Amino acid sequence: REKIGVMFGCFNYSTRVQLADGTTEKIGKIVNNKMDVEVLSYDPVADQVVPRKVVNWFNNGPAEQFLQFTVEKSGGNGRSQFAATPNHLIRTPAGWSEAGDLIAGDRVMASEPHRLSDQQFQVVLGSLMGDGNLSPNRRDRNGVRFRMGHGAKQGDYLQWKTDLLANIAHSAHENAKGARFVDFTPLPELAELQRAVYLGDGKKFLSEEYLKALTPLALAIWYMDDGGFTVRSKGLQQRTEGGSGRIEICVEAMSVGSRDRLRDYLRDTHGLDVRLRHAGAAGKAMLVFTTAASAKFQEIVAPYMAPSMEYKLLPRFRGQGTVAPQFVEPTERLVPARILDIHVKPHTRSMNRFDIEVEGNHNYFVDGVMVHNSPETTTGGKALKFYASVRIDVRRIETLKDGTDAVGNRTRAKIVKNKVSPP
């Protein structure tokens, strides 16, 4: 006896497929007209969204039902929408998952434009350690809003940072005290960073991976934002030639564990002798550098300092700033996007199921969401008389914390298939 081949799920006629030229087309029209088009597809080797040819077209007849998905996205009306059969495979951060196994609140992988250059990402990393912040988009859109703010005396410095991000849409405003703020358009590429840094306890959480990603530019921005420099000697005597001083940087906004990790990172990676102390009546956490470590740190960051902030450098390190804006063209990259709603789509005039086969990568995008090139059919072969198939769906419900440290996850397990029968 032969096993029958299995064909996976399909889409409703109106589901829009993203074409390589940036437009979209209904999958039903692509199939019915056997349109010779290129679609966007994810290449896992290159980690890029690339154009790929459609090489086969499928109209698989009527479906019993379609599940209508609504997923957050950054552009347009803030919604991605498509209708799939429950067995269609959709990409999630954990791998492929059947549409029927997903619930609202789960995340799927979507293609979103990435606008930040490597240099600009470092500006964000450094600012987050200092006076910058990331706030989630409260309108159920994908992407988070980056904000920088400084007092009236630091207007030139804020403008210097804004110029480094000038190609990102932004708005500026001033409060009654003269402090200035710059808000940038929500960026989907920063959503994961926001989730990693803000764990809900009001303090910023900096992981080992965050610290390893820092370049001297990010360290310079952190220092310019929150650092203070006290001159100990102006270098008038021969033994103090070049001057000396001591850096202190406020780390009160960081979690206790993050302060320790940052201190250890500066010691181990840059060989800087730094220690933590609590200053003043308020007991604010400060990172204190020795005079030798202060000079060494200033040597590292000097080429990345803003002209208006050179007073925080010893005279011998001034005038070295060489930072110029580096912009890049937007590229499509994968980011997690939250499912806002799933419901059974009401019956329509056409309940036919449509699918396409894509050259090479076997995936494509429907209204931005990555889905499997499903008419991969299993080839069949000799069947077992009986077989068992059990699948357990394990989901993370919440993160368990000990103080500020994540120590585990609370999970929910559900048997989603349990079958013992002749095929």
Curated annotation (Swiss-Prot):
Record's GO cellular component terms: cytosol
Top-rank taxon: Bacteria
Keyword Cytoplasm (UniProt): yes
A biological process term (GO) from this entry: DNA repair
The keyword Repeat is annotated on this UniProt entry: no
Post-translational modification: This protein undergoes a protein self splicing that involves a post-translational excision of the intervening region (intein) followed by peptide ligation.
SMART domains named in the record: HintC, HintN
Annotated CDD domains: Hint
One Pfam assignment: LAGLIDADG_2
GO molecular function: ATP binding; ATP-dependent activity, acting on DNA; endonuclease activity; single-stranded DNA binding
Subcellular location: Cytoplasm
InterPro entries: DNA_recomb/repair_RecA, DNA_recomb/repair_RecA_CS, Hint_dom_C, Hint_dom_N, Hint_dom_sf, Homing_endonucl, INTEIN, Intein_C
Keywords: ATP-binding, Autocatalytic cleavage, Cytoplasm, DNA damage, DNA recombination, DNA repair, DNA-binding, Nucleotide-binding, Protein splicing, SOS response
Family stated for the protein in its record: Belongs to the RecA family.
The protein's role, per its UniProt record: Can catalyze the hydrolysis of ATP in the presence of single-stranded DNA, the ATP-dependent uptake of single-stranded DNA by duplex DNA, and the ATP-dependent hybridization of homologous single-stranded DNAs. It interacts with LexA causing its activation and leading to its autocatalytic cleavage.
Record's protein name: Protein RecA
